[in-house]
A protein has these predicted regions:
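Non-catalytic, soluble scaffold/interaction modules
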Residues: 1-204
Length: 204
């Protein structure tokens, strides 16, 4: 507070010396205190397809870092996603129905308030839900178009806002050849995609 740099900054920005520094005091919640505690991340809409459905993952008895670190395999939030992935573990919707119902309600409120698809971080401590953070979620070009169109239909945003929300630069990803999602296929490997589109042929 009394360093030369701090004093200069206050002088430039017209900040009085008598104000002093401020401190944020926040409650710490723990998702790693037992089997009735979880931590997770979720989107209010599917960030890949734009479908209006909760999409996300959670870990039992874990902290936030564990969900994204890749050291443990997270479980799906919804029963539908868990079933589609043939997951053995129960979804949060099945294992914590009351918490899931509450989470779904607050997620909807956040999306309506911010008028955009939300990326939410949450923790459940001893079966009590804590919403930690929310922000506008990143999405694919396909999802961006669907979400924008759907939100106009839902009267959340105007047509002008919808057009402005679709970045022209990402539309290029829609022009690449892709695999038919409905086609029958034999899965030989799984992984995380690093680029848009699909290709076939001999790798040399």
């Amino acid at each position: 507070w009394n360093s030369k740099r701090a004093k200069k900054y206050r002088k430039i920005n017209y900040i009085p010396d008598h104000w002093g520094t401020s401190v944020n005091v926040q409650t710490m919640v723990f998702g790693n205190m037992g089997e009735n505690c979880v931590t997770g991340v979720a989107f209010t809409r599917n960030p890949s397809t734009g479908e209006k459905e909760l999409f996300g993952e959670y870990l039992i008895n874990a902290q936030g870092e564990d969900v994204v670190a890749g050291t443990r395999t997270p479980q799906y939030i919804t029963k539908k996603a868990s079933k589609e992935a043939n997951a053995k573990e129960l979804s949060m919707e099945e294992s914590m129905p009351k918490v899931f119902k509450e989470f779904k309600k607050f997620s909807k409120k956040l999306e309506i308030h911010y008028r955009d698809m939300q990326d939410i971080e949450f923790t459940v401590e001893n079966n009590k839900l804590w919403m930690l953070q929310t922000r506008s979620g990143k999405r694919t070009a396909k999802a961006a178009i669907k979400i924008a169109v759907d939100m106009v239909k839902e009267k959340l945003i105007s047509t002008k806002e919808a057009v402005l929300r679709v970045d022209p630069n990402i539309l290029d990803t829609l022009l690449h050849p892709t695999l038919d999602e409905k086609a029958e296929k034999k899965i030989i490997a799984t992984g995380l995609p690093a680029s848009p589109g699909a290709a076939s042929g001999k790798v040399t």
